């Protein structure tokens, strides 16, 4: 099944057990579980599609927005075709459209399934400091979706080593223009001001202004904001994924080593306050791991399974060494 998904175009594929996903919802208050979708689900096939690194070498964020749209379209097509093939073989299946959310789940701030947590349970990566999923191959520069199936498949093992370098890196924290990166958590409202420039909240703001009479309709309809809203409806461009900074600067993944290490080395947004906060997180982590100090919500007993129960053990350093070795071998193999 995983081989077939890759033949169809998936970059990464993993299998998660529906039973495990039902037992460990990311937020038990708002359970994002397969059983809420179908009581007959046995497995979830998790598909990840990489975002081409070239998008993070551009002068503005606009190319990332367009690439995101294309990546999502490709990924949904891969998952849909796989679901069709499963049904043709006698196994009822359906896909959960990537990035969809449900109003009943915390006013649509959650999807029916958390694709990040699906990826962790399917052995594709672990959550980072900013709670994006970090895959060893592509870091956080991926989108994921889930295919819910009644076929019982052997689940993949979770990665127990923390893929994220963590507090001693803090590059995502340093780069965030909204100061939204918490300690293995995210301030969603702050993040949305940059990541969802033309999202649902901005749309409500536009129409509130019209209803209250505070906004001139003719001016609004000829504004960049209204154009962004229209484009978001057509292509999801601007409605999410606007701000790629935490993705661009993360040093995890061979795509970073190959294409981004030089251009993303310097972080213009980095401030003394960012550095101080990263150091505070590091100190808090040390006391937390020693069983002292206040609890860190993102590292409590429930959430630790998705961060990596073993902590960071140097996976990025090992990966970089292997990348350099392969580069050297390729260079030596090339004819002069």
Which functions belong to the PLM regions below?
Residues 268-277, 284-294, 298:
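Short, C-terminally biased terminal segments at protein or domain edges
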Residues 1-75:
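Non-catalytic, usually N-terminal nucleic-acid engagement modules in DNA/RNA processing proteins
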Residues 240, 274-276, 311:
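Conserved SAM/AdoMet-binding glycine-rich loop
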Residues 65, 70-271:
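Catalytic cores of enzyme domains
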Residues 287-328:
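Long, compositionally biased charged/polar accessory segments in the mid-to-C-terminal portions
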Residues 34, 280-281:
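FAD-binding beta-loop-beta segment adjacent to the flavin cofactor pocket
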Residues 263-264, 268-275, 325-336:
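Compact disulfide-stabilized, cysteine-rich extracellular microdomains and processed peptide cores
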């Amino acid at each position: 099944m995983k081989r077939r998904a890759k033949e169809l175009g998936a970059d990464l594929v993993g299998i998660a057990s529906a039973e495990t996903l039902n037992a460990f919802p990311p937020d038990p208050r708002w359970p994002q579980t397969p059983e809420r979708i179908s009581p007959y689900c046995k497995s979830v096939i998790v598909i990840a599609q990489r975002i081409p690194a070239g998008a993070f070498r551009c002068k503005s964020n606009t190319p990332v927005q367009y690439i995101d749209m294309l990546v999502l379209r490709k990924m949904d097509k891969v998952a849909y075709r796989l679901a069709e093939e499963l049904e043709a073989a006698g196994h009822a299946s359906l896909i959960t459209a990537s990035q969809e959310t449900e109003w009943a789940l915390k006013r649509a701030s959650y999807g029916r399934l958390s694709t990040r947590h699906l990826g962790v349970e399917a052995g594709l990566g672990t959550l980072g400091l900013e709670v994006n999923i970090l895959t060893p191959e592509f870091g956080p520069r991926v989108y994921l979706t889930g295919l819910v199936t009644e076929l019982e498949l052997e689940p993949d093992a979770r990665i127990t080593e923390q893929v994220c370098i963590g507090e001693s890196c803090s590059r995502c924290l340093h780069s965030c223009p909204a100061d939204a990166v918490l300690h293995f958590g995210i301030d969603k409202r702050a993040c949305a001001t940059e990541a969802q420039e033309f999202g649902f909240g901005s749309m409500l703001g536009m129409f509130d202004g019209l209803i209250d009479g505070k906004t001139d309709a003719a001016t609004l309809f000829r504004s960049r904001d209204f154009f962004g809203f229209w484009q978001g409806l057509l292509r999801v461009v601007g409605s999410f994924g606007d701000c790629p900074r935490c993705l661009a600067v993360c040093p995890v993944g061979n795509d970073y080593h190959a294409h981004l290490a030089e251009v993303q080395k310097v972080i213009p947004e980095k401030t003394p306050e960012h550095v101080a906060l990263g150091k505070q997180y590091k100190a808090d982590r040390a006391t937390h791991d020693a069983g002292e100090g206040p609890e860190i919500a993102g590292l409590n007993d429930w959430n630790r399974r998705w961060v990596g129960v073993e902590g960071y053990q140097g996976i990025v350093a090992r990966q970089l060494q292997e990348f350099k070795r392969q580069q050297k071998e390729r260079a030596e193999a090339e004819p002069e």
